[in-house]
């Protein structure tokens, strides 16, 4: 472990951690929110004196080529945005959480620095937790397309953490799309016809989707 057993005493302040005489509390984001926010969101010029704020130069420039290594490194910045978002949600500061996610997309746009399917799913859920249903729907629409493509490619993928069945069920439940939920459970029933959990959920969604042909 490169943190030599001190991980519970390392507080995140940007792209660096500060060793502090305070142990992190379980399930809390151990960050310095004011410093982290300043580093991630403040626009700074050039100065001989210290000013907080990352420049993010060129990261939203469509004329610049980013290879896979660049894209992997950018996830360190995204991790900082996401930890600040989780902190705000934990504090009940949902507006700040949404603003932080919006700032991340502005500075590190997915269309240029693409995120993997699992991370997109997590971001959509953060918007939902923060009460931004419209933005949840926008992100989850993209996640849904990717999940359906994965399902088409490998319909037996039910074990991976981000397996398409779990993702689609979560999205459709959040959106109240019972007809689509029923389709997912019907597909699972063809793979696991004797599974009691599958059978129970299939019957439940049949009851919630009257008038739909379930034959």
Which residue ranges define each predicted feature?
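ER/secretory pathway lumenal C-terminal domains and tails of membrane proteins involved
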Residues: 1-214
